[in-house]
Amino acid sequence: MDIKNVHIKNHEQTAHAPSTLEKIRKVKQGGKLSEQTKTFGSTYRRLDPNQPSPTVTRSGYRDFIHPFEDRMLTVRELACLQTFPLDWEFTGTRLDSYSSKRKVTMTQFGQVGNAVPPLLAEAVAKAVSEQLLDVIDEK
């Protein structure tokens, strides 16, 4: 497959406000903005390419800065951290939006953050299946 000619779904970058870019630029690899400003908690955290990723959460678009570029991760990049295959498509809006009844709809970022990583789910299912088969075989 020629990757140059493949459209990767859910890989749209956010157009950051100048004030957000200013915050992002301050954060070094593996660091957090809160280490410099004593605010923002765990948000604005730049990934270290040599370390495991922190847990991806529903609000992940505010948590993870690309390790090499001054921008937040895309839905697709977060999905890759969660082990979703490249052909998996997330639907709905990327960021929070409100319906006419003022209920928050599930966003693409929310779908990724709320998901059990597929490879983790597979490993758990295999382990449970093996244990159940062992119990059945014992009877």
Swiss-Prot record:
It comes from Picosynechococcus sp. (strain ATCC 27264 / PCC 7002 / PR-6) (Agmenellum quadruplicatum). InterPro entries: C5-Methyltransferase, C5_MeTfrase, C5_meth_CS, SAM-dependent_MTases_sf. Signal peptide: none annotated. The keyword Cell cycle does not apply. Heterodimer of an alpha and a beta subunit. Pfam families: DNA_methylase (PF00145). Gene3D superfamilies: DNA Methylase, subunit A, domain 2. Residues 1-135 form the SAM-dependent MTase C5-type domain. Keywords: DNA-binding, Methyltransferase, Restriction system, S-adenosyl-L-methionine, Transferase. This is Type II methyltransferase M.AquIB. The keyword DNA-binding applies.
